[in-house]
Amino acid sequence: LPLKAMLDAGRYFLRKQQRSTGVSDKELIKIAVKSLGLDELYPFDPKKKIIEYILEEEASKGKKKLVDMTLTDFADETASESPAPGGGSISAYMGALGAALGSMVANLSSHKRGWDDRWEEFSDWAEKGKVYQTELIKLVDEDTNAFNKIMDAFSLPKKSEEEKAARQKAVQDATRYATEVPFKTMKQCYECMSVAKAMAEIGNPNS
């Protein structure tokens, strides 16, 4: 099954219930599965049924991703003598948590008693927060990968003039890429402040 079809189905059934759609993909899939009865005969395992998850599982075999670690393991990895993950990955994760908090307030506001006529307004804000959160989560590993590319470039052979030229170009390309990633993080963090600002102004004050 295509991931988009499952997510769209989850949003559809949530909207029919006038519930916020700004929730995790995992929750949207769960709603779709329950509403469509896909688990009536046997358990529905998204990792084995959804095309994108199957391909991602195959592509990531043997690769350790930061975002798959527990919080404790992530902190321990950061504290280790390895130079990565560093400030860039940590900043991206902190930004993702900030976006998640904005979505939390939006979701709580969407379901606040007495605000029934505003559920869709807050649902839209929760969706925006989720988009920023998703992008920033991706940047957690992307920042560390960018750093590793620089290290790989520096390790290239440099005996002949051709090798030296190829190594220099690889270092320049990797360094340029490594500057683009934190810029993306800053841009996403800045833009997600719009959700935090809106929720501070119009969101549930008890949230």
Where are these predicted regions, by residue range?
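Amphipathic alpha-helix face/heptad-repeat signature
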Residues: 90-97, 125, 132-139, 174, ...
